[in-house]
């Protein structure tokens, strides 16, 4: 036991030697004592080491294997198994490449950026976000429709790097091993598959500008964003090891694929149209780089996105699963909100099917589920915090269709006693 020799009754910290009168707290262990100041110092040391580990990027020895990555993706994203496999392998190989490139004399490996093709609300953004969370790397998103090449009104392409830098708390080393997701990438395709002699500010010009940062360059980023000017100081960010994931719906690409594989349509009947629509998602699975060239992408841009993953349109069953099964499922989120009011929230099976059908009707995919639920739940979420003795709230199919109000079950007098 730690005591001062001259004052045997006075306990001291076993690490710094200060007495209990000199510190705020002295915590006892089986044979030692530690003061609050030493605890704080230990926490600072651990925090600094954690920051250093994060800056170095994912350790390949600790990097989850492709199967493990897919298992975590399964917890958050319903279906899309083939796309998950493609992403898991691509991301695993990307960070192994970074480790290999750090060693002198290794074979030079090209970066495997990813292109996700699939309808709105099929899970493209969520997949990219979840990957970054699994790997504990900075993540940033950008909308390709807002981008223009340098010198034109709009957002500079290099501002994407600034977003990643902000996500990394301006730690350049961490940012250089992050993931950037660029949505609506199909919107920057040029209007025809032949080169244009006029300036295409939001199409081919943006592709050319993105090409530089995607393939790897040292970008000069204004620390506060906005446009560059000569008197400004810049942060230098090397994009060589940043993984770029681009996504888009690619409406009309299925027609290009149909022409290539020789699928012909007959007449204009409703049955034929329905059949073609059903096949559209399946056709995207067979997309080739040549199809993307015809869609309006320049060869260099397609070449920098070698990994292609197609997502299919979600059906009613998948929508219902999305509502209740993932770790962050909407139903679980609303139930937690009501639980904080000491109220049990129950959704009938019919209500979940009704929500799924409404989302399919709106053609907004999984991202439309929340707005449907918010609309149906608004009144009851407004009323419940002010009510007393509410035990349970039941949401039925008719509540979703605004035909009736939720069922409220109150506690009996005996239960509350």
Swiss-Prot record:
Keywords: ATP-binding, Chaperone, Metal-binding, Nucleotide-binding, Zinc. ATP binds at residues 119-126. Zn(2+) binds at residues 13, 16, 35, 38. CDD domains: RecA-like_ClpX. InterPro entries: AAA+_ATPase, ATP-dep_Clp_protease_ClpX, ATPase_AAA_core, Clp_ATPase_C, Clp_protease_ATP-bd_su_ClpX, ClpX_bact, P-loop_NTPase, Znf_CppX_C4. GO terms for molecular function: ATP binding; ATP hydrolysis activity; ATP-dependent protein folding chaperone; protein dimerization activity; unfolded protein binding; zinc ion binding. GO terms for biological process: cell division; proteolysis involved in protein catabolic process. Residues 1-54 form the ClpX-type ZB domain. Coiled coil: none annotated. It holds the Pfam family ClpB_D2-small. SUPFAM superfamilies: Glucocorticoid receptor-like (DNA-binding domain), P-loop containing nucleoside triphosphate hydrolases. One of its GO terms (cellular component) is HslUV protease complex. Component of the ClpX-ClpP complex. Forms a hexameric ring that, in the presence of ATP, binds to fourteen ClpP subunits assembled into a disk-like structure with a central cavity, resembling the structure of eukaryotic proteasomes. ATP-dependent specificity component of the Clp protease. It directs the protease to specific substrates. Can perform chaperone functions in the absence of ClpP. Belongs to the ClpX chaperone family. NCBIfam families: clpX (TIGR00382), PRK05342.1 (NF003745). HAMAP family: ClpX. This is ATP-dependent Clp protease ATP-binding subunit ClpX.
